[in-house]
Swiss-Prot record:
Keywords: Disulfide bond, Knottin, Secreted, Signal, Toxin. Residues 18-41 form a propeptide. This is Conotoxin LvVIA. One of its GO terms (cellular component) is extracellular region. It comes from Conus lividus (Livid cone).
Amino acid sequence: VLIIAVLFLTASELVTADYTRDKWQYRAASLRDAMRNFRDTRTCSPAGEVCTSKSPCCTGFLCSHIGGMCHH
């Protein structure tokens, strides 16, 4: 009976440790994805707006070097 109890407790600890490790991996992946999304959501300038190095033109628009305006 003692051997069965020890085996049961050992199995419980292994399952708990595995669950905790998976939880930390999920948190790390979520944090990585959040940082990636933050970089991808930089502000951009639409057509007719001023474009700078800090606020480039939105996708599909070009920044004219004369006047620094976004255009098609």
